[in-house]
Regions:
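Non-heme Fe(II) oxygenase catalytic core, chiefly the N-lobe of the double-stranded beta-helix
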Residues: 2-129
Length: 129
């Protein structure tokens, strides 16, 4: 596993196949997340079952999102569509699910279709802000 720091403030890229992650690999990913606030994994292919298994390595799976569409076979996976027919409903800085009594400790975003330009998702290190 190779971990590459992206900026001094936050972010690391990890070269690993998330579809076949081991407990030991998951611990290394968790440690990188704690050190760098956000981690990125390029060129991934995961089934919904692998996605939820990956999430389970990091703690209890959260309940389905109350507003957005959920995966038909695995309701704990939220399905977001952003295209001409489904424009994003927010363009503001936010943290996922902060309205809950116990917000989730992390989110896993698995982008399956990414535009050539635009469509950026940005992160900020609030500890350094």
């Amino acid at each position: 596993m190779n971990i590459e720091l992206l900026t001094p403030a936050l972010g690391a890229e990890i070269d690993i196949d998330l579809g076949n992650i081991t407990r030991q690999d998951a611990q290394a990913v968790y440690d990188a997340l704690m050190a760098h606030q956000v981690v990125f994994f390029r060129n991934q292919t995961m089934t919904p079952e692998q996605h939820i298994t990956l999430a389970g390595h990091f703690g209890e799976i959260d309940v389905p999102h109350p507003i957005y569409q959920n995966h038909p076979a695995i309701p704990a996976i939220t399905v977001l569509e952003n295209d001409a027919d489904h424009p994003p409903d927010t363009n503001d800085w936010h943290k996922d699910l902060t309205f809950r009594e116990s917000p989730p400790f992390m989110s896993i975003l698995y982008a399956q279709k990414v535009p050539e330009t635009g469509g950026d998702t940005l992160w900020a290190n609030m500890a350094l802000a």
